[in-house]
């Protein structure tokens, strides 16, 4: 693309900047006094803008930055930023002093950049469209500029892409052309209209007949070549990250497409989207520490939901047969590349089906989404080729543990102590000290099986794999297995060693459900009491973000609902953030959440 070299204020010493500010402002004022009131309103805006802006623009664009120039990380200091901001604020003041508003109310766009690229792709090099018939209007942010002689180029970026503005002195008055060169800063949001042309070098451009500053940017954008590289700052100022790195914004466009495809897929099977409470009287449906708030008017504690499950099941009790919800979940736990305290899931429930139906649905959702955003089913994730072609492997947890570790849990017997010793001996060379502690703390054979699976097997499940038939001790909401005592009809889907989905044949026996939930509460409260005893101070901050010191209560209303009768059903929860990570090749969950939760800035 012609003239894409960005001219940056950070490459200009401040003394030179201030010297240029003084001289160019005097020049611009003279220009404004001679001609400005004869311009159209749009051009008057640009003309008046130049009278107040020549200074900083000249400084910001007088020297092209390049790969061999000093990094903006050193020159774009707080003092430099404040100097830039001060100069740009003076431009704003002068604009308003002339009765012109540098923050427009509206601009009529006729096309997006991408539409223009498509509509006028037929233009040959050097060919121009009919100026009277094909007058177009566009708006976007100035991300690059260059001016020399009787020609100036601006690169404008909108939501769809970029387009070049071709600014000839012959088309604009002498005053207007100088004002264009001197006033417009990189980062400004500009509206422009004109005819279409493909330059001799092949760049499709708008030959500008008129322009207007729509929003005056006060702070400089990151350096073109070094960009916004501070990871923490990228997450804290995601808006700047999106401007500096267009591929970041593309992730969120693809995320939106994935969510849309999920809705389209499940609704094609007759599922109804519903909404359930975010503020709940009891945090149920999962075992996780909730966020707690207090409702002043009601005088009671409320919890941000940790799952949507229990209210969606109430919908089945109420007579709906296929329901789903895409919504935010909140868990007051640790943060990692795979965990954010606020995340998005789809949970769905279908009456008169079992967990085999949900395996088919999980395959369909993921493959449909991959085709929608990637156009293929073989994708790359962080250097590993993932094949999403159906059908996916389906294997029991027992068999996978035996396959990877050689330990057959069916032969360990009922003695928990002996089972722990056998496992620790067999895996002594692969277990970390914390893993051994976790094994010793297991309270049942089911917990022990799951612990070995999570530590040793789970990371090895790279290709899509359904892990079936989880122990009943860790699955309080799942129906008992029809053929294997002590197990449940539950599966989890793993891809790239990460859990993507969790599903059950849902437990509908209200008596069994109460017994299991009461046992879960009893076990948790025992751990909680131990955690409180071990705490040095009652209110001391713990290093472990996932400790057991929070309270768990029964959702009595849910248990009451079950007693009215819930039909046989299957249900599934699928993590949308992790699915987006997979399909956009994003390494961290923070890369797919626009504004992730972060530590307080020091």
UniProtKB/Swiss-Prot annotation:
Q: Which cofactor does it need?
A: Ca(2+)
Could you list the residue ranges forming a coiled coil in this record? none
Region (Disordered) residue spans: 50-83, 524-550
Knockout phenotype, as recorded, reads:
Lethal. In heterozygous plants, aborted ovules.
Q: From start to end residue, where is composition biased (Low complexity)?
A: 50-62
DNA-binding stretch(es), residue numbering of this chain: 136-214
One Gene Ontology cellular component annotation? Answer: chloroplast
Q: Which UniProt keywords apply?
A: Aminoacyl-tRNA synthetase, ATP-binding, Calcium, Chloroplast, DNA-binding, Ligase, Metal-binding, Mitochondrion, Nucleotide-binding, Plastid, Protein biosynthesis, Transit peptide
Q: Which InterPro entries match?
A: Aa-tRNA-synt_II, aa-tRNA-synth_II, aa-tRNA-synth_II/BPL/LPL, Lys-tRNA-ligase_II, Lys-tRNA-ligase_II_N, Lys-tRNA-synth_II_C, NA-bd_OB-fold, NA-bd_OB_tRNA
Enzyme class, UniProt record, top EC level: ligase
Q: Which residues bind ATP?
A: 331-333, 339-340, 499-500, 575-578
Q: What does this protein do?
A: Catalyzes the specific attachment of an amino acid to its cognate tRNA in a 2 step reaction: the amino acid (AA) is first activated by ATP to form AA-AMP and then transferred to the acceptor end of the tRNA.
Q: Which NCBIfam families match?
A: lysS_bact, PRK00484.1
The text of the family note is: Belongs to the class-II aminoacyl-tRNA synthetase family.
- Indicate what this protein is called per its UniProt record: Lysine--tRNA ligase, chloroplastic/mitochondrial
- Give the organism, scientific name: Arabidopsis thaliana (Mouse-ear cress)
